[in-house]
């Protein structure tokens, strides 16, 4: 096996995207994604059974397209990497079973990859091809909102803070439903918020009270954590009050004020975590990283704090196989032993476990 510039095939199936990506070392050769999002729209959210069946239908065509785009054959691959968690159990199982079948059929080593750490690994596919020292990662998606410290992407990832209830993306979807904006909620709210007044309504910022924050010397229990369930409830009560009075609901203003509350608390706590933990470089990733206001305010606050911000291209922020392949390549180059084929998908895989 080539351990200096390994050709790695990555498979992603943790939610509603079937992704296959191929990298050679830190060079991206192909990144093919098939999404089942349209099949979930009428339900207002991802239906696990539908997502799993969509992965079954999409995997072989997606694999074939990725190989063709990369100009390689399956036999050329040095190793296979697959998301084994966290995610939807049934969806993960489809990708893991497919990866195991390929590994057995080809005799290639198989690496079970942490989906969240893979979002950091995608930063290695950028121009510099190396992750800097003193690196942090802010991951914001439909299923996760976390701030990480990365000492080594292959074996030393520390969770500094996370949401204690809804993820930010999940809150977007639920509020969009309240406002009649449909699914997915993130893009709809982002677009509508541009026409609204974010200062028209003041929504709460969860876990920002002194009893939760504490101080740098004596941190509170949730200094770097987030909570969005109370914000979601506040939006619902706001809508109910307008409707009870018979007034028109100012949907654009509510969308803008909600988004500002989410982005404000995410960025303020992320920057706080960075400054108090010696983090000088921050990677922003996850599907919600496509949000224009989140990108804007993160950049502003990082610049003010002297933190260098990196945001991958949008197609690499959302779930994809290239990020899985990128992390797999790092494990190969670091001499980490393969996972074998006896591991099981882990829907609640902790971010501190880089590879199963």
UniProtKB/Swiss-Prot annotation:
Binding-site residues for substrate, renumbered to this chain: 139-143, 173, 186, 190, 291
Compartments (UniProt record): Cytoplasm
Cofactor: Fe(2+)
Residues the entry annotates as binding Fe cation: 115, 119, 319
A GO term for molecular function: iron ion binding
GO biological processes: tRNA threonylcarbamoyladenosine modification
Enzyme class: transferase
UniProt keyword terms in alphabetical order: Acyltransferase, Cytoplasm, Iron, Metal-binding, Transferase, tRNA processing
Pfam families cross-referenced by the UniProt entry: TsaD
SUPFAM superfamilies assigned: Actin-like ATPase domain (SSF53067)
Reaction equation(s) it catalyzes: L-threonylcarbamoyladenylate + adenosine(37) in tRNA = N(6)-L-threonylcarbamoyladenosine(37) in tRNA + AMP + H(+)
Cofactor descriptive note: Binds 1 Fe(2+) ion per subunit.
One GO term describing the cellular component: cytoplasm
UniProt EC number: 2.3.1.234
Family label: Belongs to the KAE1 / TsaD family.
Function per UniProt: Required for the formation of a threonylcarbamoyl group on adenosine at position 37 (t(6)A37) in tRNAs that read codons beginning with adenine. Is involved in the transfer of the threonylcarbamoyl moiety of threonylcarbamoyl-AMP (TC-AMP) to the N6 group of A37, together with TsaE and TsaB. TsaD likely plays a direct catalytic role in this reaction.
Protein name: tRNA N6-adenosine threonylcarbamoyltransferase
Lineage: Bacteria, Bacillati, Actinomycetota, Actinomycetes, Micrococcales
Gene coding for it: tsaD
């Amino acid at each position: 096996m080539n351990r200096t510039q390994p050709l790695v095939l990555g498979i992603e199936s943790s939610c509603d995207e079937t992704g296959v990506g191929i990298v050679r070392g830190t060079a991206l050769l192909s990144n093919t994604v098939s999404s089942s999002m349209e099949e979930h729209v009428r339900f207002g959210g991802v239906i696990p059974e539908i997502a799993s069946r969509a992965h079954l239908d999409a995997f072989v065509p997606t694999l074939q397209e990725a190989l063709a785009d990369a100009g390689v054959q399956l036999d050329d691959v040095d190793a296979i990497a697959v998301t084994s968690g966290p995610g939807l159990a049934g969806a993960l199982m489809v990708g893991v079973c497919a990866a195991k079948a390929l590994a057995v059929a080809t005799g290639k080593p198989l690496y079970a990859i942490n989906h969240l750490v893979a979002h950091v690994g995608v930063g290695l596919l950028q121009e510099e091809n190396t992750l800097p020292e003193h690196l942090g990662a802010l991951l914001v998606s439909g299923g996760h909102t976390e701030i990480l410290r990365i000492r080594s992407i292959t074996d030393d990832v520390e969770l500094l803070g996370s949401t204690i209830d809804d993820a930010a993306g999940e809150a977007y979807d639920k509020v969009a439903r309240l406002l009649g904006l449909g699914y997915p909620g993130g893009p709809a709210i982002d677009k509508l918020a541009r026409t609204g007044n974010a200062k028209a309504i003041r929504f709460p910022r969860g876990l920002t009270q002194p009893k939760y924050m504490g101080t740098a010397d004596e941190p509170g229990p949730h200094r770097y954590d987030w909570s969005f369930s109370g914000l979601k409830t506040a939006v619902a009560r706001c809508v109910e009050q307008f409707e009870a009075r018979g007034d028109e609901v100012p949907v654009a203003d509510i969308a803008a004020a909600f988004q500002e509350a989410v982005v404000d608390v995410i960025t303020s706590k992320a920057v706080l975590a960075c400054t108090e933990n010696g983090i000088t470089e921050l990677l922003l990733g996850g599907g919600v990283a496509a949000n224009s206001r989140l990108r804007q305010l993160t950049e502003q606050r990082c610049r003010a704090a002297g933190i260098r911000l990196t945001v991958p291209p949008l197609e690499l922020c959302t779930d994809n196989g290239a990020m899985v392949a990128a992390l797999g390549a790092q494990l190969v180059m670091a001499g980490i032993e393969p996972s074998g084929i006896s591991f099981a998908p882990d829907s609640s895989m902790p971010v501190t476990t880089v590879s199963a």
